From Swiss-Prot:
Enzyme Commission code(s) on record: 2.7.7.3
Protein name from the UniProt record: Phosphopantetheine adenylyltransferase
Binding site for substrate: 10, 42, 74, 88
Gene: coaD
Subcellular location: Cytoplasm
Example of a GO biological process term: coenzyme A biosynthetic process
Pathway noted in the entry: Cofactor biosynthesis; coenzyme A biosynthesis; CoA from (R)-pantothenate: step 4/5
Family affiliation: Belongs to the bacterial CoaD family.
Domain of life: Bacteria
Disulfides per UniProt: none
Annotated organism of origin: Klebsiella pneumoniae (strain 342)
Sites where the protein binds ATP: 10-11, 18, 89-91, 99, 124-130
Length: 159
C-alpha cells in the first residue's frame, strides 16, 4: 500500500525551512503533495500561481513531490486527494498550541486524518516566511534562507 502525505501551507514564499521539511517527508512517504493555500485573508505578497511556480521549481529535484494549490478546508482537500496524513513543521513551543488545535479540528472533520509533526533542522528552526519578507523589505540579506529562484523573485517583487 502506498502512502500519500500532504504538506500544507501558504508558502509566501517557500523557504529553505519548508524545503527541509518537504525533503524529509519525501523520504518517508511514497508521495507528498505540497499543498499551497490560497489564503486571501493573509494578503500574500505572491499570488497563488506565483507561489505554485516558485515551489514547483524549488522542489523539482524531489520526484515524488507534487505542488498543488487549494482553497477549501484541509480535511476536504485531503479527502479529495485520498490522503490521510498531514505533515506539519514545528519550529518552537509557540507553534505547538496552534498546530494541536488544527490537528484536533482536522480529526473532527476527517477522523482518519493524522498529523505528523517534523522539526526543521537547527539551521532553519527560527525562520518563517514572514520574518524573511520583513528582513528583505529592509534590505537585509535573506539569500541564505531561500532557494535561489525564490530569492530572486522576492528581490524582483520588492523593487
Amino acid at each position: 500500500m502506498s502512502t500519500k502525505a500532504i504538506y500544507p501551507g501558504t508558502f509566501d514564499p517557500i523557504t529553505n525551512g519548508h524545503i527541509d521539511i518537504v525533503t524529509r517527508a519525501a523520504s518517508m512517504f511514497d508521495k507528498v503533495v505540497l499543498a499551497i493555500a490560497a489564503s486571501p485573508s493573509k494578503k500574500p505578497m505572491f499570488t497563488l500561481d506565483e507561489r505554485i511556480a516558485l515551489a514547483t521549481q524549488a522542489t523539482a529535484h524531489l520526484v515524488n513531490v507534487e505542488v498543488i494549490g487549494f482553497s477549501d478546508l484541509m480535511a476536504s482537500f485531503a479527502r479529495a486527494q485520498q490522503a490521510n496524513i498531514l505533515i506539519r513543521g514545528l519550529r518552537a513551543v509557540a507553534d505547538f498550541e496552534y498546530e494541536m488545535q488544527l490537528a484536533h479540528m482536522n480529526r473532527h472533520l476527517m477522523p482518519t486524518l493524522e498529523s505528523v509533526f517534523l522539526m526543521p533542522c537547527k539551521e532553519w528552526s527560527f525562520i518563517s516566511s514572514s520574518l524573511v519578507k520583513e528582513v528583505a523589505r529592509h534590505q537585509g540579506d535573506v539569500s541564505h534562507f531561500l532557494p535561489a529562484n525564490v530569492h530572486q523573485a522576492l528581490l524582483n517583487k520588492l523593487k
